[in-house]
Design a protein with these regions (language model features):
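Proline-centric
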Residues: 1-9, 134-144, 172-184
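A short beta-sheet element
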Residues: 72-73, 88-152, 162, 171
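Generic hydrophobic alpha-helical scaffold/packing signal
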Residues: 44-47, 148, 155, 179
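Low-complexity, Lys/Gly-biased intrinsically disordered segments
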Residues: 38-82, 95-100, 163
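Non-catalytic DNA-recognition/assembly elements of restriction-modification systems
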Residues: 2-54, 181-184
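Short Gly/aromatic-enriched secondary-structure transition segments
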Residues: 59-61, 87-90
């Protein structure tokens, strides 16, 4: 048992280190040494920014155990992996229709926009999110991995663009204007 726990810990540390190396490599290759042909633009040039929504909690018929995946920032705080397919709750078709939640495709980069700003994961299937997200559905000209690492790299800029008195939040309109390097 001790050996199993030790190996799990070792894998966790190794995965964290690999993630840090990938982020550093991205910054060096695609931000510091971006190709001269790449243009300056905004996140909107990388993909479509989509907000989330919460169906009324007073309507139990809007929630189910095996429905449409519905992700909250809390889900990303508990599951710190790069990919996510389900959170603690799912919503029903009725809940989806009676809210402004949208189904986003696999490969969407989920980005928590408040409380806290900056939890990031990639949808490993179709998902919806609550209003604590400004997610990016990558355009065809850039890949999911590029958007994922771009958002990780842009986190300080995004945090500086956030506003709010009780807690900081980045609005959808502000998120769309975050400066970005656009690959050709």
């Amino acid at each position: 048992l001790f050996l199993e726990v030790f190996l799990i810990h070792l894998c966790s540390v190794s995965n964290k280190n690999l993630g840090q190396q990938a982020a550093a490599y991205f910054h060096h290759q695609f931000i510091v040494n971006a190709a001269p042909s790449w243009k300056e633009g905004t996140i909107s040039d990388l993909g479509t920014v989509i907000g989330g929504s919460t169906p009324s909690k007073s309507k139990p018929e809007y929630y189910t155990d095996n429905g449409i995946a519905w992700i909250t920032p809390k889900d990303l705080s508990v599951d710190k992996s790069k990919f996510i397919s389900h959170g603690a709750d799912d919503i029903t078709e009725l809940g989806l229709r009676n809210s402004s939640a949208s189904i986003m495709p696999a490969g969407t980069v989920l980005f928590s926009s408040r409380a806290p700003i900056g939890y990031i994961a990639i949808a490993d299937g179709e998902v919806t999110t609550n209003q604590g997200f400004k997610s990016v559905v990558p355009n065809g000209n850039v890949g999911t991995a590029f958007v994922y690492y771009f958002l990780k790299n842009a986190l300080p800029t995004i945090e500086n663009m956030a506003s709010g008195s009780t807690f900081k939040e980045i609005s959808g309109s502000a998120m769309r204007t975050v400066p970005a390097v656009i690959p050709d």
